[in-house]
A protein has these predicted regions:
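Basic/aromatic-rich interaction segments and small domains that mediate binding to polyanionic partners
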Residues: 2-87
Length: 87
């Protein structure tokens, strides 16, 4: 079950953190230039937190820069694993 409001707690990740996608991610139609349903990421892809935002005043959304793929994808905490904290 989804948390009622993640915003009561601090973000799980900070700008500069190195993270890994836990599972493959498909375009839900919000990523421009790539067909809906097409894979954006594979499980294990590594990226860096560029910024932290919110969605619906309930959830943190992390802008992850997947440098090797050349894309910036908004992801939720349950889709990511911390590999290395920012210095």
């Amino acid at each position: 079950m989804e948390a009622i409001c993640e915003l009561y707690d601090p973000p799980a990740f900070e700008a500069g953190d190195k993270v890994q996608a836990i599972r493959a991610v498909r375009n839900d139609g919000t990523y421009p230039g790539i067909a809906m349903g097409q894979f954006l990421l594979e499980a294990g892809d590594v990226g860096y937190v560029k910024s932290v935002g919110t969605y619906l005043n309930r959830f943190y959304v992390y802008a992850i820069d997947f440098v090797d793929r050349g894309i910036l994808v908004g992801m939720r905490r349950h889709e990511l694993e911390l590999l290395e904290s920012a210095p």
